[in-house]
Structures are given as structure tokens and as C-alpha cells.
């Protein structure tokens, strides 16, 4: 393939797997970005020879600049560097694999340059979905989701000529490591317990979100924004086997599902090659060896983060951004062993109680809601 990518977040789980796919497909890499992982991005830059490498942390960027001084790779830092990578003229596809709100501005900048967006940064759509989708339509940019669930929905809708035919999008959810526990049992679970996802290998933050089911809440909001559907048309079910990645139900009673092994390189590869499909070295799904496929309703009283996310989805406005910011701060505190897992929804609710509705919110309002929510959580922690 001749596609050239700018990879935002190259040292995280999705970023590393994206480079594996790039290697398999023979893609060129125009830009790499990370936070401050000097050693890993140096290795990546030496292999893929990007024109641009970015470390958000200035001290780390200074060290990388010295290490790559005898190469043709330019090293930048900060948001300026991220924006340069996202708008690189020699990249036709921007893979947004960074975690959190930091991916929002680079994504919007890439959209204005009419890039294909391979979207793995769910916070972009959760916090500013209407702005992002409106911008993509305005500039003619293509958004291809990388999340396994949204990739599944995207694939199921390829033959759908009229979105009015959709009755429901159904996102599947493994249930995480704590499926079936009571609230009392959940309260004593530790960080080590929460990081043991039954089916997927992911980064720490998204693994904790999967344990609290916040990840599914974020994905419900993401689907609402991406396909412009109300909450009543987007649902989630527990599917422990992670074989059915999501389903679309149509008004005529038909239901389409996308099945596959739980391997993130499959949706990454599809986002790189769409509308075509490339031969994959991955082990194919063997239907004769599949376990029985089961589906169940999530327990929103135990996993309150899912309930909170749905409430914010129904309200809209800046509440999704506030919820996301508060969740990021609370999860970070949990990963530092400062709070228990059941304190995460408590902190999110405390931040939402302080959030005020903004009439027709703009990007600045969304960023401010995120900032204030984080501030509330930090004050509670102190």
C-alpha cells in the first residue's frame, strides 16, 4: 500500500500495534508522537524513519533531539508539535491513538486538512463529538473508527443506504474482570485485580475503565456522536467471549453482527485499508471451536460509571466533557493507590454537581468544563 500515516500516540498499546500493522502492510510513517517515552520512540524512529517525531514533554524532546541528531527526523515538542504531526503534508491518514482530551485539538486540525482520521481516541467524540463530526462534514474528512466495537458498527453499516433504517446499535462488553460481583465484593478489589482483563491486552487507563464499565459508557456516547443517534437507539450488552464485537438492529427485524478474534490489529488494519481489506496474518476465528456465545444485561447499580455516562449522554452539553475529565483524574488516583475503585464514580458525581450548563458550547467551553471537573476531583483528593 502507498498510504502514509501520522501516528499520534506511538508508544501506547494501540500505537505499538499500529506500527506492527504498518510494518505488515508496508505503510510509510510520516510522523510519530508520544508523551515522554524517549527510548521507545527513538527505536521506532530509527526503524520507520519519520520526517517528524514529537515528544510532548520538552525535556524528553530535548534528549530525543540529541539522540536523533544524525538522522533526517525533526524533533518537536508540546501541543505545537502534535499539531504539526496532525497536519503533516506527507501523511494522508492520521491515527489518533493518544489517550485523553489532549487528542482533541490535533484531531480537529487534521480534519481541517481533510485527512482520513483513524480514530482510536474516544475522548475526542465523547467530549466534542458534535464539533468533530460537523467539522468532518464541513471539510470532507473521513473518520474511520479503530475501537473494536465502533469498527464493528462501521463495517455492519457499509450496506446501509438509509440511516433511518437503523433501529438500534448494540455495543458488546466483556464485563471486565469484575463481572457478576456485588457492590460489597467490588469495593475490596485492588489495582492489580482491576488490571487483569479477561480478553484484551490494553493500556492501564482503558483497562480500569473496562473494569468500571466506564469504557462502555464512553463508547455509547461515541456511537451517538459518530452516527448522530439518540441514547434510546444505542445500547450495550455483556458478552463475555468478546467474539461478537457489536451489532446493528434494523427496523425490519434483521440484525447484522461483526465477529472476530479479540485482536486489536484487526480493526486497526481495516482502518488503514478501508474500503479495501488486506490479507491478515492473524489467526482466523474458527467457528467450530468457538465457545457458546452469551449475552446479558449490565448491572448499572454495581457499575455506576455506566449509569453516570448514560445520564451525561442524555443531558449532553458540556457534561460529557466534565465526566470524562473527572474520570481521568479519578482513574489516575486509583492507579496511584490513593483511592478504592468504588470512589471513582463518587468523584465523578462530585465534579458533575459543580458543572454548569453552557448554551451552545464551543471548544473553549468544552475545555473549560474539562479543566474545572479535574480541579474538583483534585481538591477532593487533597
Predicted ranges, named:
Residues 1-382:
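Catalytic, metal-anchored helix/loop core of enzyme active sites in primary metabolism
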Amino acid at each position: 500500500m502507498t498510504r502514509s500515516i501520522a501516528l499520534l500516540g506511538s508508544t501506547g498499546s494501540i500505537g505499538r500495534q499500529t506500527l506492527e500493522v504498518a510494518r505488515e502492510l508496508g505503510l510509510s510513517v510520516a510522523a510519530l508522537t508520544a508523551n515522554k517515552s524517549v527510548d521507545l520512540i527513538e527505536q521506532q524512529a530509527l526503524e520507520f524513519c519519520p520526517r517528524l517525531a514529537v515528544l510532548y514533554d520538552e525535556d524528553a524532546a530535548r534528549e530525543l533531539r540529541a539522540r536523533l541528531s544524525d538522522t533526517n527526523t525533526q524533533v518537536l515538542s508540546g501541543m505545537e508539535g502534535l499539531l504539526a504531526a496532525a497536519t503533516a503534508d506527507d501523511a494522508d491518514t492520521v491515527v489518533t491513538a493518544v489517550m485523553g482530551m489532549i487528542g482533541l485539538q490535533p484531531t480537529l486540525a487534521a480534519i481541517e486538512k481533510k485527512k482520513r482520521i483513524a480514530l482510536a481516541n474516544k475522548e475526542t467524540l465523547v467530549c466534542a463529538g458534535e464539533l468533530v463530526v460537523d467539522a468532518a462534514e464541513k471539510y470532507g474528512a473521513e473518520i474511520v473508527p479503530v475501537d473494536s466495537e465502533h469498527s464493528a458498527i462501521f463495517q455492519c453499516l457499509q450496506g446501509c443506504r438509509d440511516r433511518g433504517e437503523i433501529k438500534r446499535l448494540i455495543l458488546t462488553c466483556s464485563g471486565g474482570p469484575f463481572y457478576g460481583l456485588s457492590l460489597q465484593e467490588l469495593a475490596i478489589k485492588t489495582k492489580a485485580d482491576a488490571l487483569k482483563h479477561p480478553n484484551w491486552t490494553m493500556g492501564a487507563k482503558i483497562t480500569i475503565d473496562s473494569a468500571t464499565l466506564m469504557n462502555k459508557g464512553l463508547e455509547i456516547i461515541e456511537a451517538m456522536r459518530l452516527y448522530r443517534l439518540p441514547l434510546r437507539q444505542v445500547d450495550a450488552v455483556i458478552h463475555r467471549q468478546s467474539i461478537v464485537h457489536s451489532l446493528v438492529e434494523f427496523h425490519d427485524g434483521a440484525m447484522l453482527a461483526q465477529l472476530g478474534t479479540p485482536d486489536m490489529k484487526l480493526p486497526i488494519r481495516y482502518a488503514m485499508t478501508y474500503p479495501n481489506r488486506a490479507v491478515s496474518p492473524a489467526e482466523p476465528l474458527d467457528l467450530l471451536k468457538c465457545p457458546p456465545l452469551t449475552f446479558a444485561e449490565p448491572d448499572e447499580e454495581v457499575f455506576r460509571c455506566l449509569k453516570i455516562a448514560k445520564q451525561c449522554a442524555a443531558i449532553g452539553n458540556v457534561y460529557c466533557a466534565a465526566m470524562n475529565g473527572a474520570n481521568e483524574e479519578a482513574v489516575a488516583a486509583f492507579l496511584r493507590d490513593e483511592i478504592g475503585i468504588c470512589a471513582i464514580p463518587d468523584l465523578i458525581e462530585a465534579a458533575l454537581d459543580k458543572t454548569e450548563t453552557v448554551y451552545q458550547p464551543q471548544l473553549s467551553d468544552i475545555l473549560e468544563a474539562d479543566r474545572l471537573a479535574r480541579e474538583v476531583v483534585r481538591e477532593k483528593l487533597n
